[in-house]
């Protein structure tokens, strides 16, 4: 009876979540007989960091409470983040060995493996921890351009074309996210999230609120700013709430006591998800409008295209930020998605956009596109990962492209999609 119930549960999950494949990276023997893994290109978000600003900043003034005593300096990778990333590296080690891409304890030559991180401490450290789990005896070099911490142009999601025509089209596309009410509509959709985060902050009890320095979150004060050679930015309630959302998410992962993480409030998982929604929306607004995405992601798209087309390469690990994954996804036309088992629904901490190159017995090359991430429970519990206890895997769909019966895109189609995104940048006036 238990076995039948389990099978029925799996069937139900397949029907309700057709895009979710819990074991996408572990293939059947029939699949393995048909395809061989040739290469992986991974774009990773750094793992858990401390907030960029906390006590003493605007973020600190928003609440009468003290934020967590972090195990790292501001914006740097925490001890927990290092452990979690090592576990993810160990999982990819087990999987690539199982698929025959590498042998156990393999030491690659300089052309086979490329680990490249943005020159921010949290990115370099994430790549270092990943490499320790992935190839523990290989002493892999982490490539980064500058002494920490400085943004590398490859990973810097900045506007490099900023004409009036660009700004007009960008704002048109951003406003469409909010329907007929535009930016106001985007903020209206966050009404519940704003209410919850204000309550958890006990914002009205803060000295800054009582002095009028901090105000209630409203729906009509968001302003988007585009400046040449700078990241898209904003002013207003959404920006202010995002800084608190970011800090709460990190504090929830870092602090074992969920009530302590919520400053003594008992929150449901749904309420934590609504807090995280603010950050998800903030990222969407700034980085996923199509014309903005192809603008800010252009250098990274070119680099990833080159890696996918380097014959000697077997494994590429690029470590950047949530804005990198969000903009690359949008530029490539990834269909809208919402991740299960995570309070962050788009680009969870430590998540990885994975392009898998497979070659069939006839020599034809295919690509699978997945988002690999640790569930909220796995992050909080620091669960060990292996082939029997895998991270979450979500199959991403590319608009207008057709997968074969095995869920793979033709390599030509994926290459062409990269080229379309690169040409779209050239077409910005």
Where are these regions (language model features)?
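Bacterial N-terminal signal peptides that target proteins for export
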Residues: 1-9
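Signature for phosphate-centric chemistry
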Residues: 24-112, 118-316, 320-429
């Amino acid at each position: 009876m238990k076995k039948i119930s389990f099978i029925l549960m799996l069937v139900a999950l397949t029907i309700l979540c057709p895009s979710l494949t819990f074991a996408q990276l572990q293939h059947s023997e029939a699949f393995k007989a048909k395809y061989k893994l040739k290469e992986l290109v991974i774009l990773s978000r750094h793992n858990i960091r401390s907030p960029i600003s906390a006590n003493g900043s605007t973020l600190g003034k928003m609440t009468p409470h003290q934020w967590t005593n972090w195990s790292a300096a501001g914006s740097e990778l925490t001890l927990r983040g290092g452990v979690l990333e090592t576990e993810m590296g160990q999982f990819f080690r087990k999987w690539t060995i199982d698929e025959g891409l590498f042998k156990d304890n393999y030491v690659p030559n300089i052309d086979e493996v490329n680990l490249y991180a943005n020159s921010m401490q949290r990115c370099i450290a994430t790549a270092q921890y990943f490499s320790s789990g992935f190839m523990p005896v290989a002493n892999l070099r982490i490539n980064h351009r500058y002494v920490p911490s400085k943004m590398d142009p490859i990973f810097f999601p900045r506007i490099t074309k900023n004409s009036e025509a660009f700004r007009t089209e960008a704002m048109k596309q951003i406003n469409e996210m909010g329907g007929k009410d535009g930016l106001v509509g985007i903020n209206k959709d966050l009404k519940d999230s704003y209410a919850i985060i204000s309550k958890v902050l006990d914002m009205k009890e803060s000295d800054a609120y009582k002095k009028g320095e901090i105000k209630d979150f409203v729906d009509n004060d968001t302003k988007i700013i585009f400046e040449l050679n700078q990241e898209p930015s904003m002013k207003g309630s959404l920006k202010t709430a995002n800084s608190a959302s970011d800090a709460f998410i990190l504090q929830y992962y870092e602090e074992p006591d969920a009530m302590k993480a919520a400053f003594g409030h008992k929150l449901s998982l749904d309420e934590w998800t609504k807090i995280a929604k603010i950050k998800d929306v903030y990222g969407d607004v700034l980085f996923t409008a199509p014309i903005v995405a192809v603008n800010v992601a252009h250098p990274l798209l070119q680099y990833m295209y080159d890696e996918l087309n380097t014959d000697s390469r077997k494994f590429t690990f690029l470590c950047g930020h949530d804005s990198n994954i969000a903009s690359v996804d949008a530029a490539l036309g990834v269909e809208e998605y919402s991740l299960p088992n995570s309070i962050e629904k788009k680009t969870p901490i430590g998540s990885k956009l994975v392009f898998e190159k497979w070659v069939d017995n006839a020599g034809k090359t295919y690509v699978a596109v997945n988002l690999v991430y640790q569930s909220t429970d796995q992050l909080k519990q620091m669960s060990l990962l292996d082939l029997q206890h895998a991270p979450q895997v979500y199959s991403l769909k590319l608009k207008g492209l057709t997968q074969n019966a095995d869920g793979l895109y033709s390599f030509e189609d994926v290459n062409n999609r990269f080229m379309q995104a690169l040409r779209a940048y050239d077409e910005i006036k």
